Amino acid sequence: MSELKVDTGRLSHIANSGPMSILAYCASSILMTVTNKCVVGSDKFNMLFVMLFAQSLVCVTALVLLKALGYVQYRPLNKVDVKNWLLISVLLVLMTYTSSRALKYLAVPIYTIFKNLTIILIAYGEVLFFGGRVTAMELSSFLLIVLSSVVATLGDQQALAKKPLAAAVESILGLNVGYFWMFTNCICSALFVLIMRKRIALTKFKDFDTMFYNNILSLPLLMLASFMFEDWGAANIARNLTKDYIIIMIISGLASVGISYCSGWCVRVTSSTTYSMVGALNKLPIALSGLLFFDAPKNFLSIFSIFLGFLSGIVYAVAKQKKQSQPAN
């Protein structure tokens, strides 16, 4: 069984506070995005698999410590569950790797906006594989998502037009590579979510079971990929595994633990409706953090695309809640 310990002591007013859970969830999301961008956005860093390995290792270590302290419970490793969950871990590695590659080339606001395209793939995947349906309001949110992506692209082009020719050509090549990795990530993310839904029904996993198995099974896959595809020469290791990079990777890993923990916390002390709305609203501060901390395009189209992406998230969250409240046919 996987469960989260609820504090009933002196700090119970914090542990049961809706606003605190929402702030913690938003802060964790922003922290993870910003720290990841700090690492992958550097021209010096080229060991993404090592970064992902470090993040998964931090997650596993944190879960083991939390379990030892009695704050969480999760299912121990066993052959049957490992066999059933291995494909999910492979998809997780592909999803996180392509996400990191996209984040390397794209500005945080653009990355956040294009990430919404995954919602469309998942929705129609559920129609194909689970007999779901898409409501008119959901379709409206999808149109807003596509529109926000188009406007974001136009904003990028407007920013490029102001650069010298050589710099503009280099930036265009980088953006095209980023778009490729972003669309690949959307496909991997949709497959991950859709197949994981089936496997959760098979294994009866709870939240912390999923988190533990996702990360611990990813460790050997990530290390193998690193040894196969990355440069483990002394000079490259010295350039990549500096004290600053290691600290940022640890912080990012802890932030991912925080996101998972705060997700369950938020649902427990508020409601699934509030949580879904927070997920939609959280797109705005993440995108704005990219404008604040990094050299992202700052023109009308770029800002407007963030607003459209934010609006599409709200419309989609409301549409999902309305659909869930309707009686099944």
From Swiss-Prot:
Signal peptide: none annotated. GO terms for cellular component: cytoplasmic vesicle membrane; endoplasmic reticulum membrane; Golgi apparatus; Golgi membrane. InterPro entries: SCL35B1-4/HUT1, TPT_transporter. It comes from the Eukaryota. It is found in: Golgi apparatus membrane; Cytoplasmic vesicle membrane; Endoplasmic reticulum membrane. The keyword Transport applies. Its main location: Golgi. This is GDP-mannose transporter.
